[in-house]
Amino acid sequence: MLRMEEPPYTPSVNKREKSSFLDSFPMEYPTGGIGDYRESCLNVRNEAGQMGCEIHYVSHEIYNGKKALKGLPASFGTEEEVQTLDILCEDEILGLQVVLSYSVFEKENVITRSVKLINKGNQKLKIEKIYSACLDMDNENFEMLTLHGAWARERHIQQGPLRYGKQMVSSIKGESSHQEHPFVALVTPGTTQQQGKVYGMHFVYSGNFIGQAE
């Protein structure tokens, strides 16, 4: 039996300890193969073919400015314009380090995010999936807003209520385009340019991509 306001996949016959259920908790960067059945950001397979990754906080660093992403297009700013938080996490069994970077452009009201993996172990690891970010938040009857279009008319707004399950915008063309724009926003009903809540996520540049709400 599930009580009202129970986490979606947590069976319970009493009100005692539920902390063993990972899908009961908000996750900053969820990983696959450890018992959380929501969408993961990172799936890693080891040399034995086993898939599972569990990262834990190690340390963090805050500094002015923003480091370049080697080989990738990215936003940039001076030490006066942007401040960055790097969070180092690690899976000790795999010897895998994960660096989560958050750069705050305060005047623009923008936070940019990126992820870097560092293999410190002795085995080869296969990255099955890696996503740039996760935003785990309470539902406020959000609607999902996406953009699509055609040549010379790229920005048609499509908006509708979030349904149970998963909704997404994606592309497997190897590039982003007017057909599927790499942008998703969650907005409260009745939101305008002057009022309402808007949480938007957008790739600076993109090949194949997926933006998904669950």
Label every PLM stretch briefly.
Residues 1-214:
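Polysaccharide-binding surfaces and accessory modules of carbohydrate-active proteins
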